[in-house]
Regions:
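Bacterial N-terminal signal peptides that target proteins for export
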Residues: 1-9
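Bacterial N-terminal signal peptides
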Residues: 9-18
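Short, non-transmembrane alpha-helical segments in secretory-pathway proteins
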Residues: 23-43
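Extracytoplasmic/secreted envelope proteins and their assembly/folding machinery
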Residues: 28, 32, 140-143, 176-179, ...
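Thiol/selenol-based redox catalytic cores and closely related redox-interacting motifs
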Residues: 41-48, 54-60, 64-67, 71-88, ...
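Extended, non-globular interaction scaffolds
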Residues: 93-96
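A short beta-strand-turn-helix
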Residues: 105-123
Length: 252
């Protein structure tokens, strides 16, 4: 049986634990309310305290990450760095890579246009692409070399002009129609080759294609333009990269 002094200490410790639990819960709600008041279009997915710091990592439903004080009065948009024995470690980049890696693992090859590696597969890269993008075409010309090096290229659709061409959402953009026509073709690889080489493809929109889902996924990944290469690790490599340089980055 605890003596009165020990009972008092235990009670005090329990009260402190309850206080901090409530404080952490209320911090997330406080941050959510602050976001809603300042920018209603910014919706909080979750808020997690940065280990040992009076700072919260705020993940939005869009996939973007902010940092906030517990009272929700100050927000920082950008990367958070941790100074340690490794130098300056980009905490935000690591967090984003981890999120993208989980999403990449859930992708289905049947929903993409896949150019399989020749011989032993040494790596897989996922590329958000648009038919009307000059650097996307330049990267596509590197695909045979990438395949020779043992790298499988999996294309996801990212129409830079968006899906709809009008406010009433009744007309599709040209880039959307071209990409969907590739996905609806019986031979997606040949259709992609033709579209990349000429910029033209016979219109075929009579199928269920994941174009809009890919566009949404790209936004969650932080894609801001095309091409955008996502490695198996979740790392995002924006823009064009020559085949041999990409292989070197992959350790091949």
């Amino acid at each position: 049986m605890l003596n009165p002094a020990k009972t008092l200490v235990v009670t005090a410790m329990m009260a402190m634990a309850a206080h901090f639990a409530v404080a952490e819960e209320s911090a997330e709600e406080t941050i959510a309310k602050a976001l809603r008041a300042a920018q209603p279009n910014l919706i909080l997915q979750n808020a997690t305290q940065v280990e040992g710091q009076a700072l919260y990592e705020v993940e939005l439903t869009s996939g973007e990450i902010l940092y906030s004080t517990p009272d929700g009065k100050y927000f920082v948009y950008g990367s958070l760095f941790h100074a340690n024995e490794k130098g300056l470690e980009n905490i935000t980049a690591k967090r984003n890579d981890s999120k993208r890696q989980a999403l990449v693992e859930g992708l289905k090859a049947d929903d993409m246009v896949v150019f399989q590696s020749k011989g032993e597969q040494k790596a897989v890269v996922n590329v958000f692409t648009d038919v009307d993008c000059g650097y996307c075409r330049k990267l596509h010309r590197e695909v045979p070399r990438l395949n020779e090096l043992g790298i499988t290229v999996r294309y996801l659709a990212y129409p830079r002009a968006g899906v709809f061409a009008d406010k009433n959402r009744t007309k599709y953009t040209g880039s959307y129609k071209k990409l969907k026509s590739v996905w609806c073709d019986d031979d997606r690889m040949s259709a992609m080759n033709k579209a990349k080489a000429t910029g033209f493809i016979k219109e075929n929109l009579k199928c269920e294609a994941p174009i809009e889902a890919h566009l949404t996924l790209g936004e969650q990944f932080g894609v801001r333009g095309t091409p955008a290469i996502v490695l198996e690790s979740g790392e995002l490599v924006p823009g064009y990269m020559p085949a041999d340089e990409l292989a070197k980055k992959l350790g091949i």
